Each structure stands twice: as C-alpha cells, then as structure tokens.
C-alpha cells in the first residue's frame, strides 16, 4: 500500500491574506483539514454539493466563514462554487482548491482574470503511485523533469500553482 501521494498545500503562503478554500465532490474533505491548519487574515470556505445532502457542514462552520452552493439550489447558492463567490461578492488574495476538473478550470480562469495567487490539487486515477507508468499525467504550463514535456504526474507533483 502506498499513500498519501503528491504534495500538500503550503499553508504558510496564506498568512496575513484573505483566502478562499474551495472544494467540490471528493475534493471537499481535504479542504476541511486545510481549513483547520491554516492561519490567515480571513478564511472563506466555499464548498459545492449536488443537493441538500451536505456533509462536514458543522466542522466547516467551526473552521471559518462557510459558503455553500448546491446544483439544485436546495442549500446556499444555486449553482457552483464560482456562482457562490459572485453572489456573495467575496474577495480573496489567495485560493486553494480541490475538486473535479471543470470546477478547477473555472477557478483557474477566475484567478488569472483577477490576479489572484492560486493553488489547486488535481484529482486523477493513479496506477503505480510512483510516477513510472504516467497513467495520472495531466497537461501543465511547466515542463515535467521526468518526461521533459508540459505534463505533471499527479502522484508525484499533485499540487499545482496556477
């Protein structure tokens, strides 16, 4: 058994800053642990669910300002985490996110458009867990030292700065 894989978030980068901690789907639980560890000026936790069957709600409320979005609008903002940010007119200096690829793409675009430092944790299936098989590769702006192409091995590089 191998794990955990990849690199964690650097919580010290958020010190003295307003932070978004954003999670969706199976990316929600890792954001809770990050919220517990992080010391920053303002901690805004934005999590997305499909419906009212939310989980870890009380724990998130104890860790920071919680904003919820649901696809069906049954709890919080109707839509996704980006809809919640826009509806609540939230502002941040740094973003940490974990969740499905479409959510992470939207967060990356938002961060780039607004000049916000952004760190994402990518979700991919991992076969070997040591970077040899390249099953978990995704495209990246930076060249991977292993393959010398614009890819990241999620099992080895996991966290991405965008």
What is each stretch, according to the model?
Residues 1-125:
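FNR/FR-type flavoprotein reductase catalytic core
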Residues 30, 101-102, 123-159:
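Local cysteine-cluster metal-coordination motifs and their immediate loop/turn environment
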């Amino acid at each position: 058994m191998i794990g955990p894989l990849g690199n964690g978030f650097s919580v010290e980068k958020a010190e003295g800053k307003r932070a978004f901690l954003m999670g969706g789907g199976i990316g929600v639980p890792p954001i809770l642990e990050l919220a517990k560890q992080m010391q920053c000026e303002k901690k805004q936790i934005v999590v997305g669910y499909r419906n009212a069957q939310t989980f870890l709600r009380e724990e998130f409320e104890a860790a920071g300002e919680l904003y919820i979005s649901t696809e069906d609008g049954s709890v919080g903002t109707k839509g996704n985490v980006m809809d919640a940010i826009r509806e609540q007119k939230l502002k941040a200096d740094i973003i940490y996110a974990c969740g499905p690829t479409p959510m992470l793409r939207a967060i990356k675009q938002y961060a780039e458009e607004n000049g916000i430092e952004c760190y994402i944790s990518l979700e991919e299936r991992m076969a070997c867990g040591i970077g040899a098989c390249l099953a978990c590769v995704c495209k990246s702006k930076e060249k991977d030292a292993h393959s010398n192409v614009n890819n990241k091995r999620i099992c080895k590089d996991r966290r991405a700065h965008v």
